[in-house]
Structures are given as C-alpha cells and as structure tokens.
C-alpha cells in the first residue's frame, strides 16, 4: 500500500521516471519473514519494549506540516541548483519509501507470532511513510513527483537474511541521523545557504532516524549471534565498508548539491563516516580504522574509477567497446574494496570502552 501522504496531487504535477538502478541507487529489500516471526526477543525484551513505548509517543506527529515558506521557494533556485536538488529529493524519497515498504511488510507478516516486533516495525513504517510523503510533496513544488505505486510494483527487490537486514538498516538509519543533523547544524550557522525550507525540518527528522537505529541496536543485542564471534565481525566489517564506500562515491559524484549548501562533499562525508563508525562501536564488535590515511586514499581511487565508468557509459561507443573500456575500472574497484576490507579493523571494546 502506498501511504496516502505520498500520492501525487493535482493534475499539474508530472510523474517523474525513476532513475536507472545502479550500485549507488537506493535498494528495495525483502527478507525471511518466518525467521523474523520466530525470533526470541527475551535476551533484550525490556529495552525493545522501552523503545516501542517511545515509538508510540510519535513525537513528530505534528512536525511535518508545510508552511508559507514553501510558497515560491522552488522558483528562486537557478537551473543547476534546481537540478541537483531534485536529484537529492528523488534519492531521499526513494530511500525512505524503501524503508516504509520493508517495515510495513514485516509488521504485517509477523504480527500474529511476534506482536512486539511487529508493532515496532509498524511505527517505523509510519515514520518512513511520513518522510517519503514530505519529500515527494517537495518534488511537486518543482512540477513532478515519483509514482510510488509504480516503484512498489516494478522495483527489483534484494533478498537479505534477517541479520543482514539488521546490519544494513542499522547503518542506514544511523548514517541518516548524522547526515541530517550535520546539514541542519551547518545551515543553522549559515542561513544564506539554506536553498529550500525542507532543511528546517531536519533537526526533528533526524531523531526519527536515530530512534530507528536504536531499535536495530537493541534487536541485534536480542540476537547476540549477530554481533558475537569471528563470522559476525567479518559481516560487520563488510557492511560498514559497503555503506561508507557507497555513500562516499555517490556524494562526491554529486558534489554540486553540497556546494549549493556551502559544504564540501568530501569534508562532510568524512565527518559523517567518522561519527557513524564511532556510533556503530556501541553494538558492532569491530569498526573500521577510518583514521588511517590509506582508507581515504583507497576511497578516492573508487571515486576516480567510478568517474571513468560514468565517462565510458556516456560515450557513443558500441556496447562491446564500452564493456572493454569499463572492465579495468571494475577490476580496479574490486581490488580497492578488497584492500579496504583487509585493512585491520578496530575492536570496539578498545575503540569506545566508555560507551560500551
């Protein structure tokens, strides 16, 4: 079901074609619902119940209400800023809507067997639907919206085992918190760089992301095998690296958006990665050594390879020639990711003992 707040309104709004799926675009996920329903929450049930009680309060129930500041705001943007801002809205809306679909389906499918877990997912689905609808409404200020019903039916869904859903969504929610709060604080100090009134909502908005991340933190502690043992350490390293590398490459590629806000994409991402890495030490057994200069050097090589891949894609060459041109950069990306993964990780007990 598409949330009512996210449905296009008015005949003057055009439906925007979704962007082509790439490794950098938001994914849609599904999982093993029976395994989720059968999960024993007893090892950390008290904390999960406390988090659910926080969700029930719905602190942002009345927060996402548009005001007169939105009127005519879209018309004030120059064409280039308008273009990169619409891209930001689309990516963000798709990501939030992806979360809504996953959480809503989980709440529906596990309700009979695991009511506490189902209720938590229902509350998070409510939040994600609200976010997606608010973003899509902002897109309508630019004369277009996403057809979220079409996305629901036509997007490819990636299957993840429950523990992989936990790792990926925990990081997505926590990184979302740090991204939103960093932009909000920057614009609070630099109001002339606030290109659109949606950024006024980011302070409360990011608290939804933070609470969702806390839920997955508590859920992993209720399933201790997800964060204990050598295999769990490897998976935590993998997901940290995958999420950080994807964000860094994507954001540097669209650095013009951050420049429009008066931010440097690399500096911004470095701060977000450092903060998310530090936060992750509260639940993950290991985190990445993001203070190692080699970490950033190798991310920059991924950026360069990705730019070369984009250039090859944009050329007029025939498909076989494009493939041959792209092959060295795919191999290069694989090699750099392997080097990043093999860098020594940091044990979380040593990294952040006070928090743990």
Swiss-Prot record:
Pfam families: Rubrerythrin. Catalyzes the formation of the isocyclic ring in chlorophyll biosynthesis. Mediates the cyclase reaction, which results in the formation of divinylprotochlorophyllide (Pchlide) characteristic of all chlorophylls from magnesium-protoporphyrin IX 13-monomethyl ester (MgPMME). Its EC number is 1.14.13.81. Transmembrane segments: none annotated. HAMAP family: AcsF. It catalyses: Mg-protoporphyrin IX 13-monomethyl ester + 3 NADPH + 3 O2 + 2 H(+) = 3,8-divinyl protochlorophyllide a + 3 NADP(+) + 5 H2O. Belongs to the AcsF family. One of its GO terms (molecular function) is magnesium-protoporphyrin IX monomethyl ester (oxidative) cyclase activity. Its cofactor is Fe cation. Pathway: Porphyrin-containing compound metabolism; chlorophyll biosynthesis (light-independent). PANTHER family: MAGNESIUM-PROTOPORPHYRIN IX MONOMETHYL ESTER [OXIDATIVE] CYCLASE, CHLOROPLASTIC. This is Magnesium-protoporphyrin IX monomethyl ester [oxidative] cyclase. It comes from the Bacteria.
